[in-house]
Structures are given as structure tokens and as C-alpha cells.
Amino acid sequence: MFLLKVLSKAGITLALAGSVVLTGFQLDESSSVETSKYDLSLAKYVAATPELADKAKELGFDVSKVDPAEKIANNGKKFQQPGDNHVAYKEATGDIPVLVILAKYKDGDEPIGDLDGQVPAKYYEDLIFGTEYNPYELDVFKEYDGPNVPKDRTMQNAYQESSYGKTHLMRHENTEFAWVELPKGASYYLDQEGTYAENGRYVLGNVNGDAHTGEFVRDLLKAADDQIDFSKYAENGEVPNIFIVHEGTGAEWSRDPAQFWSHKWNLLSALYYGKYYETGIPADVYEGMSQDEWIAKTEDEAMTYDGVIVNNYNIQPAIGGNVAGFNAATGEYDEASVTGPYPAQVGVYAHEFGHALGLPDFYDTAYNSEGVGNYSMMAGGSWMRYPDALQYNGNSPTHFDPFSKIFLGWVNPIEVKPDDGVQKITLPSIDQADDDNGIVKMAVPGSNGTEYFIFENVQQSGFNQGLIRQGGDAHGLVAWHVDENIINLYQTAGFRPNNVANWMNKRFQHNQSQTASDGTVVTHYGLSVLQADGKYDLEKYVNRGDAGDFFKSGDKITPVSGNVHTGSYYFWKGYGSTPADSGIHVTDIVENEDGSITAKFYYSTNEGKKK
């Protein structure tokens, strides 16, 4: 999820006003208003490419469009210690149906820089459902082939590897994939000049298709209705998610305003806010209706197919690269900025479908920090690559983080408890582990199980081969901190769990003792990586990860181990105090020759606590 569109606080209030029925594999925001079963919310975008983010830092332009009011999340509680706000996990195992629609614009009206014609549809079936994907046999991509280029980097394989074989993506149709043509072209859906806007202008803009995204999805569903039996995918009368692949590239490559930015959203909200972007007035007010009346009308006219509701969707591009040559620093198009076209890769696809399964973004969508950086599919990890070259961006994304694996029911972590004594545990590389031997979990005593640390062994093998982007030494034990009280706010109030300051001089200040009561006091991530070198590069927006983040042979982590420690993030005692001693120790770390890691995990409360 990336760019939140700029709305007024009133718009944000509307965005959080609806409640949502949790159907299928979808988990979305909800709140106290019960007048509608639908969620009027803002889109969730994939992270910008590392190249675009780095260029923004170097040249000083803002890559985000996040509204500060996004942080308004009324949890209704203050607490001086960890709360009891657990995340509601949502298992995603077994056969998971994925309804895929390939969308092409009206012939002769394609996006700037697009290919001549479409990539044959079978390649997207391979990329999403297959076990092999070889776009390099096509003439347009042949130059990027080579002996070290993997051909097994599919969404199916990514989910299989991260879930330890528990999740299988499938489709109900036995027909071949085919492109569905829209009734209008790119010049309409992505128009920048106001040609198709009311009164010849967009009040708030059609950047990345803001004003017409809802129409794009609505028109696509109507065009595909004769080819798809939507009822086959429905659960409790609603299709959980539509997976849209659109012709052209994505704005996440360049910030090009005339391209869609890959995201997860719902049709109702896209239509509602589309009219807002065009006219400055949301759709219900524009049409002189109450919100309930407008929702009922839209459900009947745009969201009902084969007797079921179709609302939630995610959208991603058919090709990669800055094919139009948009220069984000100047706001102009130039030949020197052109990259690609590159074949579509699994990273963005798998990331966006993670949202469909209920996962939040674990990067900072305001681009003030990096969140968990390259260490999760739900953050910058969706852009990892092998070989380490631009044309392979996203072809070898990092595994889903261990919290996400727990959330989706993919793993049963080894739980070490205070009474267990010293546990000497050998962890295989996370890509070679089983579902019950790859992750160690240690809860902070007194936290009601909502605050805990997780440890995993990450090596450059399997999909994690893409970590070569951080150099050959980027491997070892990765330590995570989880605060479910904060992640819970994603489910209950739409709060972005990693859009906060998290580094040392912020994390233990006085306002750490309360959370989300007025929307401004959350001062640590819901999910964070404890970087072994203690530099807090992720929090300080220095990089998305480096070799210094991994714990290696001879390292240790304790409640008082310098700048990086397992001290609780709660129980603040005042300025100058150390954080509460959780007792959590990981010592005697050894990276073995076979890639496994052996370490001692134990509790020793108050041992060696700094005064």
C-alpha cells in the first residue's frame, strides 16, 4: 500500500465510517458505525521501487502523498503497560481461489510507452498459478535472459515456499486466459488534462487514475461478465477479491501520474472517492442522495454479477519499467529516463495479494522511514531480485515476515517460555524449514501475549536469494519485535502500523505509555527488525537493509545489550530510565557450515540490568 490520496479530514472520517463484513480471505478496517456493511476506505499501495525512493532522497522530492490525518485512529484506550488488543488472525491455507482478469484498453488508445500489442495471456497464468515462468522466450524480453536468471519465480511458488506447502492458489475456470477489452482507452481512465473531467478540469486531480479508477474496475467487470461466472468465487454472497492485471506499467516504477499505481482497494470506495477527486464532492452528495441510498444504487448497478457482490480488488501492471520516461524530479517526460519494458515479476503481485488475505503494509507509507525494509514481502522485500540488476526488480522477493506467517496460519513457532530454562535450538534456513521448526517466539512477561520477539534464520537461498541486493554477507539471524496492540489498529481503525517514529530516542519517551487515543501518540512500529549493528538505518530512512542487520556467530541480544536489545517497549519509568527488562536472551549464536544457526534462547529476568 503506498500513496494515500490527499483528502480532507472530513474525507478521512468518511473513509473510516463504514464497517465491513469479513468474507473469504479479506480482512479490512471497521469501526463503530453499523449503518452499512461496506467499507469506504482509501487505497493501499505497493511500495515505490528502491530506485525511485533513492532518487527522491537524493534530489529532495516527496515520493508520497500521505494525508497526516491518516494517523487518526480512535482505539479508545490508554494504557501504562501492554494492552490486551490481540490481532485477529486469518488463516489462509488449502486451495485459495484467485479470480484473475487481464484488462486491455480500447484498441488504439494505450498508455504512453506501452508495448505494441499485449504479452500473450498464458504468461500471466504461468506467473500467477504456474511453477515455471519464462517471459524471456518472447522477443521483447529476450535480451534479459541468461544462465543465472531463475525461471521458477512465480506467485504460486512464492506462496508455497513461504507457507511450507500449506497454501495453493487455484482458479475455477478451465478456459485459457484471455485479455478483456475495456470500452474506453487510457486517455480516458488516466487523463491528466481534464479533457474528460466535469467542466473540463479535475478539482483534486486524476493522478494515477484517481478520478476514474472506479470506472475502470466497473467497466472491466461489465466487460468480463459474459466470460466469468462470478458466483463460483463467492463466499457468503460476495467474491473476496478480484485480481486485475492491467495493460502497461505501474507508477511505482517512476511516479508517472499517467499510470496506475498498484494497489488494493474496493470498487465502492473507488467510485465514491473518484467523484471526489474529480469534483471535490463525494459521489453521494454529488448525486443528491444519502450515503445509504447511493450505496444501494451502486450495489445494484455496478457491484452485482451472477447474483453475488463483487467489490474488493487488487490491481497490478502487465509490464515493468519507466516505459514513458517520466522524470519524477522535473515532472516532465524525457528519453533519458526511459527504462524497460521489463517482464512482469512476482513481487508486486504477491504483495498485493497479501493485502487480499488481510495483511497490512509493514513499510512506512509516508516515506519518513523504511519500516521493516527488505525483510518482508509486505514491505520493500517485494522488490528483491536475482540477478542483482534493474530488469529483474521483484523477481525474487523476500519471504513473508514471521508475524505474517503466524497470522495466516502457516507456522507453529517454537515458543520458549520463562520456565523452560536454557533452550539450545538449531534453526534451518527459513526457506528450508518446516512449519514447526523455523521460528522461535518469546513473549514479554506481563504483556498478555501482545508483545513478543521472533527469531528466524535468513540465508540467500530459495526466494531469499534476492537478498543479494544487500551484498553477499546479508544473511544470519533476524530478530523481530511485534506489538499486536498497534497492528490491531489496522483491523479496527485503519491505522498504518509502521507509519511512526521507531528509533531509540523516540521509542522510550513519555508518550510511549499510551497508544492511539488521540491519533498522535503511537511512537513505535507494530512490527520492527532489531538491526544488529544498532544504527537504526531502517527507522532513520538510511536504507532498506544491509548486512549489518543480521546477528552472526559470536553476537548476542539481551535486555541490556547496548543500542539493540530485547527490553519491553512498555512500562516506561521516566527520563533516564532503561526500558523494562523482559529477561529475553539469545546468546552463543553460531552460523553453521550447512547454513543453519544454533543459539541459546532463555529468560533471565533482571540479570545484569543497567542501573
Question: What does each model-identified segment do?
Answer:
Residues 2-27:
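Sec-dependent N-terminal signal peptides of Gram-positive bacterial secreted proteins and lipoproteins
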Residues 28-86:
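N-terminal zymogen propeptides
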Residues 33-46, 51, 111-118, 123, ...:
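Non-catalytic C-terminal accessory/binding modules of secreted extracellular proteins
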Residues 68-92, 146-316:
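Active-site-proximal segments of metallohydrolase catalytic domains
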Residues 85, 90-125, 204-207, 248:
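Fold-level signature of zinc-dependent metallopeptidase catalytic domains
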Residues 95-99, 236-242, 373, 448-452:
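Loop/turn elements at helix/coil->beta-strand transitions in domains of secreted/extracellular proteins
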Residues 189-207, 334-339, 343, 356-443:
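A domain-level signal for the mature, folded cores of soluble proteins
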Residues 347-361, 455:
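Active-site recognition of the HExxH zinc-binding catalytic motif
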